[in-house]
Amino acid sequence: MKKTLREIAEYLGGTVSGDGEVLIGGLATLDDAGEGTLTFLANPKYAAKVATTKASAVLMGTGGNTHGKNAIFHPNPYLAFAKLLTLFYTAPAKPVGVLPGAFVADGVKLGADVSVYPGASIGAGAVIGDRVVLHPGVVLYPGVVVGNDVTLHANVSVRERCRIGNRVTIHDGTVIGSDGFGYAPDGASYYKIPQIGIVIIEDDVEIGSNCVIDRAALEATRIRRGTKIDNLVQIAHNVVIGEDCIIVSQVGISGSTQLGNHVTLGGQVGVAGHIKIGDNVMIGAKSGVAGNVEPNQVLSGIPVMPHRDWLRSAGIAPKLPEMKKTLSALEKRVAELEAKLAKGE
């Protein structure tokens, strides 16, 4: 598929600079672009590459330096490029129906245009919406409810009675609804607390590969609308994550913690249990959150503190060995002076 630069600009709501009739047949990065491709500039640190890229045109922020290249100006070039990927990329065709080798138990309700690949298994009483795709190895336990336009990639498991909303994508190897980590000490060992709740994944959520979201002990672990979860994330039982949150890889969230809306947790953040994090909070990578966090803050560190304070503390840390030597020398000198004063010298 080829489109003129002007057609692409009209599709995006952008403005053409240069030859609007140049044909674009693909998309590429600044470094790898060639003739007939469109590239994009979203991060100013790469602005110098616009002068050297071999792309036929560049998508960039309004008023950017084109270095004489054909361009589309757009107020949000990153978002615009994402939309172009959808326009230029054609997803592989998928078969419709239950393919040989898939297992569908009695009492399952399948919506229209469902694709169930070989090796997928759907338990009794499950309800599957329209245009759902279940890739090989997907296992839906009895009583699972899946909304419309959902894609579950290979080897995703959704345990009994859990509920998946509309337009949800879950990537390979993720487990939804495994038992929460709950044990009661009995004096000699530990008694397993039955985890009889569920997990609810609301609409427009995307979950990466090899994540685990544990079922609640009694009610529901809930991931609210629009949240995006990276790979290798652990979410414990009874956690509630608000709308439009970003949870980056290797985050661990302990049981019964609640996140507000628009919360961002950087990679490897650890969050203690039974706490609340307010709306619009950003937590830097590798931080430890041990207590409640008020809304509208940017925090980092272990334990978390205002991000600017953490940067100052981190800058001091490499100097601590030398500072210790200096402090020891000062302490020794003060002790010598005090001894002289005591002798009346």
Curated annotation (Swiss-Prot):
Enzyme class at the top of the EC tree: transferase
Signal peptide range: none
Gene3D superfamilies xref list: Hexapeptide repeat proteins, MurE/MurF, N-terminal domain
Source species of the chain: Geobacter sp. (strain M21)
Record PROSITE patterns: HEXAPEP_TRANSFERASES
Protein's name according to its UniProt entry: UDP-3-O-acylglucosamine N-acyltransferase
GO-annotated molecular function: N-acyltransferase activity
Pathway terms, separated by semicolons: Bacterial outer membrane biogenesis; LPS lipid A biosynthesis
Family to which this protein belongs: Belongs to the transferase hexapeptide repeat family. LpxD subfamily.
Pfam assignment, any one: LpxD
Enzyme Commission designation: 2.3.1.191
Superkingdom, taxonomy of origin: Bacteria
Subunit structure: Homotrimer.
Entry's Gene Ontology cellular component terms: membrane
HAMAP family tied to this protein: LpxD
